[in-house]
């Protein structure tokens, strides 16, 4: 059973599709395709701490056999002046070919575990059309927001005061992402892991 909840927003160029699936299939691959009117010969796929461009067409039999590739939180297909970013919160097999974007939602292999993934699944992807390039339209930030949504919590006042806004650490350029902040294991310092996400020089 597949149930989808589609959300449109008045002031946000984003369509969220939440999927609720009760999966009991055997040797079935479930994919979703989005037809797109974007003309380009390459697409951009997020990888760990960066992104990579891959062709949107097949040149060799090896390309033809590779029906999908991996990506992390987002993929983007853009032509000059317009594009579409597709965000996801846990599905990493995808492809962009012949004017359509495909995502693998579920598969039910029989080896090594014949009952793998036979359960309830809940996941979301988002369609984000944009003018210009993905770098100028917060694709990376939107993907992080989908994967790490804000969570409100109640806290009793313990006598201190807080400013209206506060951040432990911040950057002043949009193409540098603070990925991890942790306490050092061999001292009193703090370890901050960050990376540049646009393939651009930065200071």
Language-model segments: what does each one mean?
Residues 1-203:
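C-terminal (or distal) subdomains of carbohydrate-active enzymes
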